[in-house]
Amino acid sequence: AAVAAGIVAFAHGSDGGGSVRIPASSCGLFGFKPTRARLPDGPYAGEGWAGMAIDGFLTRSVRDTAVMLDACEGPDLGAPYVAPALGRGHAAAISRPPRRLRVGICDTTFTGEPIHPEVAEAVRAAGRLLESLGHHVEPARPQADVPMMMRAWTDIVGVGSALSIRSKLGDRAPRPDEVEGVGRGAWA
């Protein structure tokens, strides 16, 4: 909200299921979830949610995000691996003419349900813009078993969260001041 209101130029966020990308798309911002290990998570942080939770940015433009990536990317202390650097930088790459891309656009949900007409038109307008820039654009809808995806996502998040909690608590039970009432029941 602060970026969309013009209070700040960028904001940090972590994204494991859309926490950066979804708010950005609702506010007219650019939300970016980079490749794993592109940005540091903090000393010895490892991976949140088995690598699905990734630190990223919300900005007003691709250019702002590229500048932030140049400023922030790199390994951190104790990182199990690191994404290789781009070379001459993300901001510099923006000024390079892009190669012709093959782009699939989807103006429905994964299950084929219609989306809001204004959103569908925005998707098609983006496709027309990409075509005008010389890219090949075609309709596409990934085939996805959405219930199975959600089950797998929930399992990964649950296990990742449990491992994170276990790493902090060790073998002791949580104290009442550490867990909300509902959480205490779930813990049992």
State the predicted function of each range.
Residues 92-106, 156-188:
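Short helix-loop capping/hinge segments that flank enzyme active sites or metal/cofactor-binding pockets
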Residues 1-76:
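Short glycine/serine-rich loop segments
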Residues 66, 124, 150, 159-162:
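Generic alpha-helical structural signal
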Residues 25-28, 151-158:
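Short low-complexity, flexible loop/linker segments enriched in glycine and/or proline
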Residues 1-17, 106, 122-128, 133-134, ...:
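Gly/Ser-rich catalytic/binding loops embedded in alpha/beta enzyme cores
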Residues 109:
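Residue-level signal for short, function-critical loop segments
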Residues 17-18, 144-146:
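Positions that flank functional sites
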Residues 60-87, 112-145:
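Acidic-enriched catalytic cores of C-N bond-cleaving enzymes acting on peptides and small amides
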